[in-house]
């Protein structure tokens, strides 16, 4: 294990991250909200930490194997999540405990969108902007992680598209491929953000809110600059714009990449995962619309469709924006939408959850087992598009599902053990492990009332969800650390 080479990379990441503190610092200057000092302090502290890690190891550029890759990916999220908590700790408004500061930072960076803050409307603009920016940078990291890095390590939903896994990865060989892909993906990400911000601005948001909400939308994060979330704007047009951009961001960025490379729009419909993703969203919208209409929750049919469309897409893509307290909907719907977050977005998107591709393959495997019961001697292969998938891929899906279920059950029991009621414990684990954000019960709006121990368990859940479980779990195996 090349610890010095890893330390060099982590140090460099922290130095780069310290530079991002300048942006909310400028926002504090523009709005004169007095929050600038927290970002100035964080800038110097992060720069010092990064330099101490990078400078002694700056010449270490040894060969990086996939083992080092796992450690770098986990350290990326844990170190930046910890450094990201500093502005909340240094800030006078909001006055957060260390636990709450870490919770807020990790929730932003993993694009979970769960919050411990109340009274957002009265907070300094710089702090509000920083929360949105954390999600945007988190989403940026996720895209590169999901499409360019995890497949090389043999983990993650995108691995299902690429059965071949390369052997030892030399630092210099790995860099151009990842850097090249990352540049194009980031270009798509930035273009979508600009388009979303402009659309929201034209729809009536002011520039600050439009930029902030475009950050959280494209990252499928769910943080808002208002306590009432998107409901603050009370605009069906804004609801529709956000829902459309959430659907675009919930797609596999590899498909957007293909479109940018000159392929036709048919590339989307040819993808079985995309078809299932749209099918799930459509089915949920129809169910929600009918139930809301039947219970006369809204006064008009158009309002019912708009609210159902927005809330379904927001929850099913794991963004977690709200327009209305869905707790006042018939109980069946909030529970259905919470469960839809288990499916989440497509592989290679900023969405959370198990990912559509895995659910699709689990269905296909279930179907194959039913056929085998009828024809025990027949040989059935599982295809994705026109390509038969090797058994190793299918074993990986079951392995992931088992690990996910294990983390889910252990987390839920641990939270119940801290004194939280069972329904809220279930909802909070669903909300954090799937990177959804809001839950039900005591965590329907925020996580303020959760006890500190439960909050740390939920922070770990956010990381497990974001790093596709295995990436983090592999670090706890003795084999990983053996030379």
From Swiss-Prot:
Low-affinity potassium transport system. Interacts with Trk system potassium uptake protein TrkA. Requires TrkE (sapD) for transport activity, 20% more uptake is seen with both SapD and SapF. Transport in the absence of SapD and SapF is dependent on a high membrane potential and a high cytoplasmic ATP concentration, suggesting this protein may be able to interact with other ATP-binding proteins. Can transport potassium and rubidium. Residues 30-35, 116-124, 203-205, 225-234, 323-330, 418-419, 440-451 are periplasmic. GO terms for cellular component: plasma membrane. Keywords: Cell inner membrane, Cell membrane, Ion channel, Ion transport, Membrane, Metal-binding, Potassium, Potassium transport, Transmembrane, Transmembrane helix, Transport. Residues 1-2, 58-65, 151-177 are cytoplasmic. It is found in: Cell inner membrane. Residues 317-322 are annotated as: Selectivity filter part 3. Residues 434-439 are annotated as: Selectivity filter part 4. Belongs to the TrkH potassium transport family. It is a multi-pass membrane protein. One of its GO terms (molecular function) is potassium channel activity. Residues 98-109, 110-115, 206, 207-218, 219-224, 235-250, 301-316, 317-322, 331-342, 343-355, 420-421, 422-432, 433-439, 452-463 dip into the membrane without crossing it. InterPro entries: Cat_transpt, TrkH. The keyword Cell inner membrane applies. Residues 219-224 are annotated as: Selectivity filter part 2. GO terms for biological process: potassium ion transmembrane transport. This is Trk system potassium uptake protein TrkH. Residues 110-115 are annotated as: Selectivity filter part 1.
């Amino acid at each position: 294990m090349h610890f010095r080479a890893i330390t060099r990379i982590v140090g460099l990441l922290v130095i780069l991250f310290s530079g991002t503190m300048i942006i909310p610092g400028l926002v504090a200057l523009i709005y004169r909200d007095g929050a600038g000092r927290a970002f100035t302090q964080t800038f110097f502290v992060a720069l010092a930490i990064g330099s101490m890690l990078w400078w002694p190891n700056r010449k270490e550029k040894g060969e990086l194997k996939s083992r080092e890759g796992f450690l770098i990916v986990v350290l990326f999220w844990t170190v930046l999540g910890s450094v990201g908590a500093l502005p909340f700790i240094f800030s006078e408004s909001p006055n957060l405990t260390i636990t709450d500061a870490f919770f807020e930072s990790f929730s932003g960076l993993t694009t979970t969108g769960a919050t411990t803050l109340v009274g957002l409307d009265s907070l300094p603009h710089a702090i509000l902007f920083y929360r949105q920016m954390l999600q945007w940078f988190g989403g940026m990291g996720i895209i590169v992680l999901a499409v360019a890095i995890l497949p090389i390590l043999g983990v993650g939903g995108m691995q299902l598209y690429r059965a071949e896994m390369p052997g030892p990865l030399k630092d210099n060989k790995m860099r151009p491929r990842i850097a090249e892909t990352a540049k194009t993906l980031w270009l798509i990400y930035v273009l979508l953000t600009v388009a979303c911000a402009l659309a929201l601005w034209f729809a009536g948001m002011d520039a600050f809110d439009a930029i902030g909400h475009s950050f959280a939308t494209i990252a499928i994060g769910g943080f808002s600059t208002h306590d009432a979330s998107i409901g603050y704007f009370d605009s069906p047009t804004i609801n529709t714009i956000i829902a459309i951009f959430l659907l675009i961001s919930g797609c596999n960025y590899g498909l957007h990449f293909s479109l940018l490379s000159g392929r036709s729009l048919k590339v989307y419909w040819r993808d079985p995962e995309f078809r299932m993703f749209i099918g799930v969203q459509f089915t949920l919208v129809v169910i929600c619309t009918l139930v809301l209409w039947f219970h006369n929750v809204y006064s008009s049919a158009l309002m019912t469709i708009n609210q159902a469309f927005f809330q379904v897409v927001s929850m099913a893509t794991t963004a977690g924006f709200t327009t209305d307290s869905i707790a006042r909907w018939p109980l069946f719907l909030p529970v259905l939408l919470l469960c839809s977050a288990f499916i989440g977005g497509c592989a290679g998107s900023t969405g959370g959850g198990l990912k559509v591709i895995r659910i699709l393959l689990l269905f296909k495997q279930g179907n194959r087992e039913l056929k085998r019961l009828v024809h025990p001697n027949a040989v059935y292969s599982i295809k994705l598009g026109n390509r038969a998938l090797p058994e190793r891929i299918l074993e990986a899906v079951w392995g992931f599902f088992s690990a996910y279920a294990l983390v889910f059950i252990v987390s839920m029991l641990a939270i119940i053990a801290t004194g939280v009621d069972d329904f809220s414990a279930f909802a909070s684990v669903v909300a954090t492990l799937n990177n959804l954000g809001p839950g039900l019960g005591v965590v329907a709006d925020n996580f303020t009332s959760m006890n500190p121990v439960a909050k740390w368990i939920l922070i770990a859940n956010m990381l497990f969800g974001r790093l596709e479980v295995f990436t983090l779990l592999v670090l706890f195996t003795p084999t990983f650390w053996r030379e």
